[in-house]
Amino acid sequence: MSNETKCPFNHTAGGGTTNKDWWPNQLNLNILHRHSALSDPMDKDFDYAEAFKKLDLAAVKKDLHALMTASQDWWPADFGHYGGLFVRMAWHSAGTYRTADGRGGAGGGQQRFAPLNSWPDNVSLDKARRLLWPIKQKYGRNISWADLLILTGNVALESMGFKTFGYAGGRVDTWEPDDVYWGSEKIWLELSGGPNSRYSGKRDLESPLAAVQMGLIYVNPEGPDGTPDPVAAAHDIRETFARMAMNDEETVALIAGGHTFGKTHGAGPASNVGAEPEAAGLEEQGLGWKSTFGTGKGKDAITSGLEVTWTSTPTQWSNDFFKHLFSYEWELTKSPAGAHQWVAKDAGDVIPDAFDASKKHRPTMLTTDLSLRFDPAYEKISRRFYENPAEFADAFARAWFKLTHRDMGPRARYLGPDVPAEHLLWQDPIPAVDHKLIDDADVAALKAKVLASGLSVSQLVSTAWASAATFRGSDKRGGANGARIRLAPQKDWEVNRPAELAKVLATLEGVQKAFNDAQTGGKKVSLADLIVLAGAAGVEQAAKNAGVAVTVPFAPGRADATQEETDIEAMAVLEPVADGFRNFLKHAYQTPAEALLVDKAQLLTLTAPEMTALVGGLRVLGANAGDAKQGVFTDRPEALTNDFFVNLLDMGTEWKPVSAANDVFEGRDRATGQVKWTGSRVDLIFGSHAQLRALAEVYGSADAKEKFAHDFVAAWNKVMNLDRFDLA
């Protein structure tokens, strides 16, 4: 007998006990290397924007309209129309978005992948996506799954008589799951009192989370932890919807508008429902939740466990939701699956059955629906919408557009003929460039003016970084375009050293005015461009100080936003609570500073080598917040040297923590005991973490002087242009 037949083959690559099992607190750099070309099946020269522009969008919409009423035996349509199912699919695709870090949302089509494809709140959406496959198959690469999911929701609304606000394509598919923090609970739908709860205090939801339980999009429809209390549920609704950038009016419009259509499904006990897609057998082919209750579909379907139809027009836009909400008193009951829900007292049977035209039912509501009546603020808005149907329709159209486009970033990324003409404040509008751009000669002249202005390398670099590093690759917000660093709230953020920033901006504005006043023919430089250009001049000068010649690329074309074009409250979420690139922590956090650095780097779409080069360079250029000396491992400040790495890796230095929290360290000369340097956790991680140390050793080597400078410039230029979608 051969060895192969004796021994079971159980040692495949990637299996076995992992590093994470051995060292659960080890810094995870994997999030910096997601969504690379290695997982993307598209050709290297594939341009999705160009592919989408060739799409016959009207033909796609026509096919989607036909699908709405083409009920399939394997998953029959409620009321003969898939509209309600597809509205829920689109809502749940977009509704994972949260403002705190911009993660989640419809971009990338993440609903196709774990964990979202198997969340308890997404039961049966596997069927919705499978219904769409023939259309996706037909149009192929010209429409992404991410775009198709949202377009289908829009067409569903339109097919049921609702006029939508518009639609934009441009969401590029991802090909692997995002690595997003959805909570620490180990059990789906874990209650708030359980281990690793996301709640503290009276009911304070952990940031950045925007859902009340693991596996839910927003709130528990039965009420907080399943307690059927509409007033208490209103607290959860307000908190979670606000964390998705929705105010009270938008929240009411979305709930009432969405619940005008379709129904929930709770025909029988949840014990009849099988494993979710990620745990189902191969034979299920990516589907999940196979039910043994009756036929397991149609009238026997089990999704949320609730059995509610809100309106008498579940496939047609109407004002029935508010009519029923206010026309009846409501009594608590339970669904056939045992879930808490509400039924109208003394109401007639006015609600159609989803599959039997001879049957009617009394109106039913969810606990969270009744919140719109029994919360005083929601009730006021709800009555106004009830009495003014046109206002309600407009509010829902706008809120739905915001919900489904919030994570797309600026209008420059919007594609297609259905993009609405109106510019909206939440899109962080930036005026179109209305002047002739500066040329190479102007760039050189402006660099000279900036360097002669009295501003230091540190000031130039720090200001450019502060302007550009607000960018978030998650929701494409922030960045240098718009020069919002000179506006509230950014100009007042602690990390930006407001008093120092004001001096720098005043000097740069003087350079800008002198240049613009001297021009003829309409040529101008925007402050947004000048801030980035000044940073480039600072980096070039720093490299020169180190004996290296570099040219930082520069592309003009940024414009200056106004205060009126800036939503102060919405912009406030971009304020860094931590920026390891500037050695900044606003407060002490439970999450280690080095993990916050990696999180920031991921939002900046940086790789581990890019992050390493930027930290090492920014330290020696004096970009620390508050001019702190931690991590400034050089006696040649404002020179773009590799001193940070050389001195960090020097075995002549012994490091010891000097704070109770182990977040400040002193590096002493091993021979004399003299303090040589001070550093933060962010600084020391580049010598402690094996993978980061390997990168630090590259840049700390004797032959790395020029390589480091050029790598820093490349990473710097990347950050400066992250929001330049016009250059893509």
From Swiss-Prot:
Active-site residues, Swiss-Prot/TrEMBL: 92 (proton acceptor)
Reactions the enzyme catalyzes: H2O2 + AH2 = A + 2 H2O; 2 H2O2 = O2 + 2 H2O
Binding site for heme b: 259
Database matches in InterPro entries: Catalase_peroxidase, Haem_peroxidase, Haem_peroxidase_sf, Peroxidases_AS, Peroxidases_heam-ligand_BS
GO molecular function ontology, one term from the record: catalase activity
UniProt cofactor note: Binds 1 heme b (iron(II)-protoporphyrin IX) group per dimer.
Numbered residues of crosslink Tryptophyl-tyrosyl-methioninium (Tyr-Met) (with W-91): 218-244
GO cellular component: cytosol
SUPFAM superfamilies the UniProt entry points to: Heme-dependent peroxidases
Superkingdom of the organism of origin: Bacteria
Positions bearing the Tryptophyl-tyrosyl-methioninium (Trp-Tyr) (with M-244) cross-link: 91-218
Post-translation changes: Formation of the three residue Trp-Tyr-Met cross-link is important for the catalase, but not the peroxidase activity of the enzyme.
Keyword set, alphabetical order: Heme, Hydrogen peroxide, Iron, Metal-binding, Oxidoreductase, Peroxidase
GO biological process: cellular response to hydrogen peroxide; hydrogen peroxide catabolic process
Cofactor: heme b
Signal sequence range: none
Pfam families to which the protein is assigned, alphabetical: peroxidase (PF00141)
UniProt EC number: 1.11.1.21
Site (Transition state stabilizer): 88
The protein's role, per its UniProt record: Bifunctional enzyme with both catalase and broad-spectrum peroxidase activity.
Assembly and interaction partners: Homodimer or homotetramer.
Stated family: Belongs to the peroxidase family. Peroxidase/catalase subfamily.
Protein name listed in UniProt: Catalase-peroxidase
